Amino acid sequence: MLYEESILHLATAGQFIVCNDKYGLPGTVLPAYCTAAGKLFLSQLDDETLETWVRSHNLVPYTANTIIDPDELLKQIRQTRERGYGIVISELYDFVACISIPVISQDNRVLGALNF
């Protein structure tokens, strides 16, 4: 879920490769702008709110692939909106790619996300 400027992991299921000792554990907070789920949730904001969000946050590079240019980030988030799912490749951790698909309510609201 989107929590202020971050993504908050609520639950984890199955086996996964651990990048560090806290990645993916319930309660983990990660930056929204460089995670697949974060881009998915940000894509649900209207254009004005999204633009304000991106331009008001300090975009820190975690890897050489982290997008820190606001215009490029806005472009990627809008592509996420068009696609309907989020993708990142080595933006938060080197050599880690993620796809995030939405969990949608009956009235078409994004309630959460599943990450792979």
Task: Give short role names for the model-derived ranges.
Residues 56-57, 83:
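Structured helix-beta-strand junction loops
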Residues 62-63, 94:
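Intrinsically disordered, low-complexity polar/acidic regions
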Residues 1-56:
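Amphipathic alpha-helical effector-binding/dimerization core
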Residues 69-116:
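Extended hydrophobic
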Residues 52-53, 63, 89:
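Short, hydrophobic secondary-structure boundary micro-motifs
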Residues 45, 67-68:
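Short coil/turn linker and secondary-structure boundary residues
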Residues 35, 63-66:
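Ser/Thr-centric signal marking residues that sit
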